[in-house]
Swiss-Prot record:
Pfam families in the record: Ribosomal_S4, S4
InterPro entries (UniProt xref): Ribosomal_uS4, Ribosomal_uS4_bac-type, Ribosomal_uS4_CS, Ribosomal_uS4_N, S4_RNA-bd, S4_RNA-bd_sf
Region (Disordered): 15-46
Record-annotated disulphide pairs: none
Keywords in alphabetical order: Ribonucleoprotein, Ribosomal protein, RNA-binding, rRNA-binding
Protein name: Small ribosomal subunit protein uS4
GO molecular function, a single term: rRNA binding
Entry-linked SUPFAM superfamilies: Alpha-L RNA-binding motif
PANTHER family xrefs: 30S 40S RIBOSOMAL PROTEIN, SMALL RIBOSOMAL SUBUNIT PROTEIN US4M
GO terms under biological process: ribosomal small subunit biogenesis; translation
SUBUNIT field: Part of the 30S ribosomal subunit. Contacts protein S5. The interaction surface between S4 and S5 is involved in control of translational fidelity.
Length: 206
């Protein structure tokens, strides 16, 4: 288990929110940050603090992306004509690990990245082992046949805690997921409020 995987719930505690909607999240029992002083009353955040928190929450949701990774995606979103916040969400949702997670082939975004990295997935019939691989509309993602009986796959497909969004079409008989279209913010089933507009404001000032 990687350090990032074992630390996944630290993100929930740091944010004080159950950002993936998981039943086992520690914030279901308490709503304060990690550490023995977590129960102290929170001070009101400044504009900078609010923007920073929005950025940390969004990049944390996609598997605690590094600042370098997230900043690169944001820079790409800025170059595309349209609302930068919407473009940012669309680019994040086009990541292969995000689609594997959305399709419920694995239970967590962290498991999705590891699953892809270990070569369990193909895109249009070709094995791809890069979680950040960017899928296009119409791409067909499939779990390789020898990987379909893995315990985490069998567990994930039975999860009732989240639904597959309508921009992904899943056929569990073939273990395929077709990326139908690039979603906007309103299409993505985030369990908590995400504010990419605040991320845009953060990078505009920093």
């Amino acid at each position: 288990m990687t350090k990032r995987t074992s630390a996944k719930y630290k993100i929930d505690r740091r944010m004080g929110e159950n950002i993936w909607g998981r039943p086992k999240s520690p914030v279901n029992k308490r709503e304060y940050g990690p550490g023995q002083h977590g129960q102290r009353r929170k001070n009101k955040l400044s504009d900078f603090g609010t923007q920073l928190r929005a950025k940390q929450k969004l990049k944390g949701y996609y598997g605690d992306l590094t600042e370098k990774q997230f900043r690169k995606i944001f820079a790409e979103a800025e170059r595309v004509k349209g609302d930068t916040g919407e473009m940012l969400v669309g680019l994040l949702e086009r990541r292969l690990d995000a689609i594997v997670y959305r399709a419920k082939f694995v239970p967590t975004i962290f498991a999705a990245r590891q699953f892809v990295n270990h070569g369990h997935v193909t895109v249009n019939g070709q094995r791809v082992n890069i979680g950040s691989y960017r899928c296009k509309e119409g791409d067909v993602i499939q779990v390789r046949e020898k990987s379909r009986q893995l315990a985490l796959v069998l567990e994930a497909t039975q999860l009732a805690e989240r639904d597959v969004p309508d921009y992904i079409e899943v056929d569990y008989s073939k273990m395929t997921a077709t990326f139908v279209r690039t979603p906007g913010l309103g299409d993505v089933p985030y369990p908590v409020q995400m504010e990419p507009n605040l991320v845009v404001e953060f990078y505009a000032k920093n």
